[in-house]
Amino acid sequence: VSPEPVRIRALEPGDLPAVTELVLGVLAEFGFTAKVGGVERDLREMLERYAGASAGFWVAEKGGAIVGTVGVRAKEGRTCELKRLYLRSTERGTGLGQRLYEHAEAFARSAGYERLWLESSRRFARAHRLYQRNGFVLLESLDNDWEDDLYEKVLSPVTGPQ
């Protein structure tokens, strides 16, 4: 029996409850329960926050269920931020995280961004390995509630003074 195919597609309004459930479920799995106010707000305002030509949000759908997410939105200038790369536990290690990341990076390049930035908790060690494999460089390790690491990847050669 061949495994069920996974389709990556743009977020639709009807996806919001399933996306919220997936993201908050992954956060709870990694021990983040109380401090998710900003995440909940981002999820509630997702259709607005990821709208327009400079942003996007995608879901991975398998058998009618949402099993992964990823987003990109403007940060400043030609830098965008990779957001909400989350996978259901059953999909980790299948290559789906890489597929979602590649989808997001392709969008960032086509939208004219030169740098991709992200902030991710050190609890997500497996995801950090994916970022490093894909050319992200650690900028800073924060001593905040989320134990965040900040990463950046240069997408295209930047000419002239920095």
PLM features: what roles do these ranges have?
Residues 6, 10-83, 88-90, 101-103, ...:
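Acetyl-CoA-dependent GNAT
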Residues 64, 95-97, 112:
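Conserved G/P- and acidic residue-centered "switch" motifs that form tight phosphate/ATP-binding loops
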